[in-house]
Amino acid sequence: MLSVSRVASRMTGVVARFSTGGHGDGAGRGGGSGGSIRDAGGAFGKMEAAREDEYFYKKQKAQLEELRKHIQQEVDHHKSQLENHQKVLDRHQKRISEIEAEERALGKE
């Protein structure tokens, strides 16, 4: 059975080993295998890593835009519901006022 300190020391070595190098520097440096072009390293590996980063940047940007649109639709929907509820509330308050006026008129007779 491994102790916590042994596991931690082993994990530290793994993190230190993989954190050397940058994206596209080749296999084993910067996160391991990413395909044959990235395994080779050099300019092509770095270019492929840059394209990959750009792809995920654009994908995240599109997802955030979709989320923003969806939330805006919800805001618009709730504003519409709020307006409808306000109209119903006003109508009910008017009806209550009319009933109270009728009660007062009946009380005077």
UniProtKB/Swiss-Prot annotation:
Protein family membership: Belongs to the ATPase inhibitor family.
Q: Which Pfam families match?
A: IATP (PF04568)
Q: What is this protein called?
A: ATPase inhibitor mai-2, mitochondrial
The protein's predominant localisation is mitochondrion
Q: Where is the composition biased (Gly residues)?
A: 21-35
Q: Does the keyword Flavoprotein apply?
A: no
For the keyword Transit peptide, the answer is: yes
Q: Which organism is it from?
A: Caenorhabditis briggsae
Q: Write down the Gene3D superfamilies for this protein, in alphabetical order.
A: Single helix bin
Region feature (Disordered): 17-39, 73-95
Q: Which GO terms describe its molecular function?
A: ATPase inhibitor activity
Cysteines joined through disulfide linkages:
none
Alphabetized InterPro entries for the sequence: ATPase_inhibitor_mt
Domain of life the protein comes from: Eukaryota
The terms describing its cellular component in GO are: mitochondrion
Any coiled-coil ranges, and where?
Answer: 45-109
